[in-house]
Amino acid sequence: MKTSEWIDISQPLNNDIATWPGDTPFSYEVSWSKEESGSVNVGKLTMSIHTGTHIDAPFHFDNEGKKVIDLDVQVYVGPARIIDVSNLESIGKKELEKFHLEGVERLLLRTSSHGKANEFPDIIPHLRADIAPFLSEKGIRLIGVDVPSVDPLDDKELAAHHQLFKHGIHILENVVLDHVADGDYELIALPLALSDADGSPVRAVIRPI
């Protein structure tokens, strides 16, 4: 039987990708060309960690929180379920209770609210804090969203961020789900081994199981 092919659910990183207002713009350039070096092109990358598809570490919103290097990489590899929660302003326990989530360890939410990697949204659907204990009771260890944040864009309290990690749930943001169906997949979304970082870009891929 042919093994299912991997499907990319990452935002392509290029000089047109949107960034958080006021954050470091993404830039890639060849800083040392083959003509200059005599053998190779060497690129230079400048970016915010929270550009494109990325994970958050607790240090992002808690000075005493774990950094990327301290996170359990097992969380970012394994079975995941995609569900559709489109056309909602916010998502919490009430909205997820209708879904069968028993045995799910990684949950990806399709909100279908934006989908334009080169435009930063003005408003996004967000997660309410009561989602965290509900997901924890189900045994879910990772939540993924197709928007830049699990909290409202202008929010300073970051209740969802805090409650999710308090309940042992890791955060994956800016995945691209508009070209895949609901259902069960194998997920790989490994962060880089960054020793002191508050997050990391990832190449997130899935394949049906």
Curated annotation (Swiss-Prot):
Ligand binding (Zn(2+) 1): 50, 54, 56, 173
Cofactors required: Zn(2+)
Entry keyword Endoplasmic reticulum: no
E.C. numbers: 3.5.1.9
Catalytic activity: N-formyl-L-kynurenine + H2O = L-kynurenine + formate + H(+)
Cofactor note: Binds 2 zinc ions per subunit.
Coiled-coil region: none
Molecular function (Gene Ontology), one example: arylformamidase activity
Residues annotated as binding substrate: 20
Protein's job: Catalyzes the hydrolysis of N-formyl-L-kynurenine to L-kynurenine, the second step in the kynurenine pathway of tryptophan degradation.
Family statement drawn from the similarity comment of this UniProt entry: Belongs to the Cyclase 1 superfamily. KynB family.
Full protein name: Kynurenine formamidase
Organism expressing this protein natively: Bacillus thuringiensis (strain Al Hakam)
Phylogenetic classification of the source organism: Bacteria, Bacillati, Bacillota, Bacilli, Bacillales
